[in-house]
Structure formats: C-alpha cells, structure tokens
Amino acid sequence: MGSSQLSTLLFFTIVVTFLTVVSSGRDLPGDYLRLPSETSRFFREPKNDDDFEGTRWAILLAGSNGYWNYRHQSDVCHAYQLLRKGGSKEENIIVFMYDDIASNEENPRPGVIINKPDGDDVYAGVPKDYTGAEVHADNFYAALLGNKSALTGGSGKVVDSGPNDHIFVYYTDHGGPGVLGMPVGPYLYASDLNEVLKKKHASGTYKSLVFYLEACESGSIFEGLLPDDLNIYATTASNAEESSWGYYCPGDKPPPPPEYSTCLGDLYSIAWMEDSEVHNLQTESLQQQYKLVKNRTISEPYGSHVMEYGDIGLSKNDLYQYLGTNPANDNNSFVDETENSLKLRTPSAAVNQRDADLIHFWEKFRKAPEGSSQKNEAEKQVLEAMSHRKHIDNSVKLIGQLLFGIEKGTELLDVVRPAGSPLVDNWDCLKTMVKTFETHCGSLSQYGMKHMRSFANICNAGIPNEPMAEASAQACASIPANPWSSLQGGFSA
C-alpha cells in the first residue's frame, strides 16, 4: 500500500472515530434543568444601588488564537456585553483577545461574533485593549497589578483599583495540569498566577476579587495554591484532573447555524453567562450561581466538575457586586414553576476542549466540494494535527519508560497527588522539564498541555535535568514538520 493510500485510510479512520465521539450522548433524557421557584431558598430581596460601595473592575482574557478556537474570544466578547449591560463602565473593563476571529476569512459573518446559535453579535463595541502579540502573561499580570510601567503595547489600561473596589477576572482557553494557554510567549503557570494574586492582596487595592476560570484541568491552577485569606473566591470549569467542554458545536443540540464549522462557546462559560443574563443579580449570590452552573455543567458521559477555591465565605456576596445587573431583569428574582418557568438547557452533547479543533477540520472537509483545494487543505490539517498528537503522546510515553523503566514508566507519569496538594513541589523544575522536552521534541501546543502532569511527576521523583535531556533526545529522533510542532511561537515555559 502506497503512502498516499495509507494517509487516506488514516484520515477516514480518524473521521469515523470522531463522528462517533460527536454523536455520542445525543439522546440523553432530561433536556432541561428547571430551576427551583422557592424565593427564600435561592434569592433575596434586592438591595438599593446606594448600598454599593467602591468601583467594579474586570479583566476578560481569551488565551488562544486560530479560528478553530472561535469559542474563547466569543466567550470574552459575550462577557463584555454582559458587564456593560450590568452598568460597568468601559474604562473599568480590560479586554485581552488576539482579535483574529471577527475578520477571519473562515468567519461566515464577517465582522460578527456570536456565542450561541440564535445569539446577537457580541463583538460590536468590544474594546481592543490588548490584541495580537500583546496578549501574554506578563501584560496580564501588569494589568491586574495596576503596573502601567510593566506593560508592553496595548491601550495602557490597568486595574487602578482602591481598597473598597471589587474585581472580576474571567479567563477562557485551553489548559493543562498547572498551566493555562497564551497565544504569545510562555504559558501562564499556576505558581506565578497565585504569587501575583498574593501581591495584589498585599497592595491593599481591592475589597474582594472573584476569578472565573474556563480551561481543562483548571482546578489545578488553585488546588493547594490559593490561600483562603486573600479575599479571593475562584470557581473553575473542571477539577484538577479532567477536561472542560466546548458547547454549541457542530452536531450538538442545538447546533450552531449550518454555515459555522466550529464551537461557538464553552459549557461552563455559557452556563454562568446565560444564568446572569436572566436574573436580577442583586438577588442572586455567587454561591447560588456556582451551584446552578455546577449542576448544568456535569452530565455523563461528558461534562466536568465545577469547583470552588479560596475564600468560600465570599460566595455569599451578590453577583451584582462584580457583574452589575441589567435593569431589564429587575423583576426576575425567582422562577415560577408554571407559566414563567425558566429553563436552563442541560447539555445534550458537548465536545472535549482538546478535540474541538478536529471537529472544525472535519466540518471543513465534509462541507468542501469534492476535489477542491479547500477539501485537500482540510484533510491536510486533520492529518497534521493527528500526527502531532501521536508524536507528543508517544514521545512522553517513551521518555517515561527511559527514566523509570518499561513497566513503571506510564504508571509513574500518570500519578495524581492527593486532593489539596499542588501539582508539583518545584515549579521552576517543571518549567525546565517543559523547555527541555520542547528543545528536543518540538512544541507541546494546546494539545500537549495534557502532559504537564507527566513533567511534574518527573520533577516530584527527583529526576535531574540531564537525564531528562538525554531521554528526550533519544525519544525524539525527529520532529514532525507541521505548524503544531513548530517552536516559531517560542517555548511554553
């Protein structure tokens, strides 16, 4: 069998596999989650605007680029519109997004971004504070700390908060154990983020801070790292060991409009925003939203466990303190079980964050005319992505076997520490191991983040960098020639 025949066979094997993934779980019972109607149980009487003290600040960050990651920038744009309708001022909302989606040649509605199938444009009016190469971890830290002198490029907008102010941070992208993606430069590491949060607290420049985090293994960003005495409350889309999920994807119920070939949003993000859009947020607490989002986000055989960290006592605060509230929802303080009942759609389908790019490439292939350059390009994209995945998985597995032996290698790389423990003891070691691997094996990319636990366990086992470098060089005799494996964008650490 020739190489072209093998490629074609591999491609259609991939297609069949992922069609099975996409179509699984479509007909689960219970399409809707009906919210309780007991006012006293879930909601309180609204407070007067005059009771609010301080200023609301927000940072909204989409940590990816590429049209296949449409959903992350869509999430951020939606969050911006939600905050503006809630009364937050543009000058107090700082937006980080690569801004390569709205005008992308693949976007079927040029200049428009939507976050749900029948949704309005959420892109119009969104400020471009930090875009393109300006979207990196150091600028995010500088903006959060209010350190204008540390910024590179961008609008110069920072969180210039005072001791009575309330800060809302929302991040959405790919992640892995202990790490969050960034489109430019090194990834954001949990240790660095938590040190920045401690520094912000030490500056005395906020009263409370809420962090909503959408990413795979996002619980690992705060697990064992975020103290409970910083006046910070965080919720995450998943625990420290599992994926988060794309939503409103091709094949979902409901699907995106037929002209779209990508996921429009993410399940956790859609859940908290769609809840916020229909309630008077003066009468709903962070804890109540956490429970509602948690219930919506977990569903077998997919879904994830939404988690909470930090100062759990802050969760009694009203959402209004951080998101404001839309005056149109003033009367939406509770749910009537009959005529006025609110139905939050539970997921009848969702897509693993790490597979959403493959869904996009398959949709491109499926829709492209036979024999067209578009069809050939889509096939190439799938094969390159799968080649990269196979290379990364096999390389990490072989490195584990070289370091720990054939029988114990995989087992030791996959060890999960007890709940409440951070991913790794020495974060500098983790960064060194990542850079060593990428030097010999090419970029981890958004997919390879899943192996961060393996590198952390190599550090936890006390393996020095020299044998790691030798094992990496032996495991990676060659690197696939494709964009995913390229180090053109720099190292991940």
UniProtKB/Swiss-Prot annotation:
Glycans are attached at residues 147, 295, 331. Residues 1-19 form the signal peptide. GO terms for biological process: proteolysis involved in protein catabolic process; vacuolar protein processing. InterPro entries: AE, Legum_prodom, Legumain_prodom_sf, Peptidase_C13. Disulfide bonds join 249-263, 429-459, 441-476. One of its GO terms (molecular function) is cysteine-type endopeptidase activity. The keyword Disulfide bond applies. Its EC number is 3.4.22.-. The active site is at residues 174, 216. It is an enzyme of class 3 (hydrolase). GO terms for cellular component: vacuole. The record marks 263 as: Required for post-translational maturation and enzyme activity. Keywords: Disulfide bond, Glycoprotein, Hydrolase, Protease, Signal, Thiol protease. Belongs to the peptidase C13 family. This is Vacuolar-processing enzyme. It comes from Vicia sativa.
